[in-house]
A protein has these predicted regions:
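Short, basic (Lys/Arg/His-rich) helix/loop patches that form interaction surfaces
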Residues: 191-229, 233
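Short functional hotspots where side chains directly engage DNA or cofactors
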Residues: 143-148, 216, 225-243
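DNA breakage-rejoining catalytic core of tyrosine-based enzymes
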Residues: 77, 88-103, 151-160
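N-terminal core-binding DNA-recognition domain of tyrosine recombinases/integrases
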Residues: 2-90
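Short, basic interhelical loop/turn and adjoining N-cap
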Residues: 136-137, 182-185, 233-240
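Short, charged phosphate-coordinating catalytic segments
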Residues: 119-142
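Basic, Lys/Arg- and aromatic-enriched nucleic-acid-binding interface segment
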Residues: 98-127
Length: 243
């Protein structure tokens, strides 16, 4: 980062005093962010400016924004971050942590809820996607599941541990079949809730379990672009917070 600060200063036609001012502000920026540019480190830096007078904040933010744009132009950043002055202390959101999902395999009488939880936590499906899964979407020979959402279709590998939970659901039209019809969203919510409550993890909502799937995939080295395809999303916008 120090080399890039020097390169940035050299790229500007400014006086010696201005060079010193830019260098001081950017070195301070580097120390606070530890050379890492992401939403959390930038928010931390913005918070350090809260005690300064507006004019000083404006000067430092201008220097940093110019530097960030320089890094973006030089291909050192995937996107351009533009900082604004904070008007009040902000809470730094901690990045969610990967949790141990082994309790999902607990032997239970709530098999519907358990299967729903496994499909969310280990395949990243949403309850609405699970509700639309048909028996024809499941291929046990190749251990894959086809998920169709609108005009998009994706084929997901099924972890072998989940196969036994699906093999007994091949008698109807849908994997979760109500006499040839799908169950309501409320039914899926209730089944999931009763299962996670029974294992002492009532905080494991569908959203939380899907987030755990995302975090687990990122930990394995998957890129956001790969996750967009796996999750059937149109863009990576909703995944940016996990970078």
């Amino acid at each position: 980062m120090k080399d890039w600060i020097a390169a940035f200063i050299r790229s500007k036609s400014i006086s010696s005093n201005s060079q010193k001012s830019y260098t001081y502000d950017l070195q301070q920026f580097m120390e606070v962010t530890q050379g890492q540019v992401n939403q959390q480190t930038l928010l931390t830096y913005q918070q350090t400016l809260l005690t300064l007078k507006p004019a000083a904040q404006k000067r430092k933010l201008s220097a940093v924004n110019q530097f960030l744009y320089f890094l973006y132009e030089e291909g050192q950043l995937e996107r351009f971050y533009k900082l604004k002055a904070l008007t009040s202390p902000a809470t730094i959101k901690q990045r969610p942590q990967v949790e141990d999902l082994s309790p999902l395999w607990t032997e239970t009488a709530f098999l519907d809820g358990q299967t729903i939880a496994l499909l969310i936590g280990f395949l990243g499906l949403t309850p609405s996607e699970i509700a639309e899964l048909t028996v024809d979407d499941l291929n046990l020979d190749f251990q894959v599941l086809t998920v169709q959402k609108g005009q998009t279709k994706r084929v997901l590998d099924i972890p072998k541990e989940i196969l036994p939970y699906l093999e007994n659901r091949l008698t109807g039209v849908y994997l979760f079949d109500k006499k040839g019809q799908t169950y309501s969203r409320q039914w899926f919510f209730n089944r999931l809730t009763e299962f996670v409550s029974s294992i002492g993890r009532s905080d494991w909502t569908a959203q939380k379990l899907r987030e755990q799937y995302i975090l687990g995939q990122i930990k394995q080295g998957k890129s956001l672009d790969q996750l967009v395809k796996q999750l059937g999303l149109k863009s990576s916008m909703s995944l940016e917070k996990y970078k």
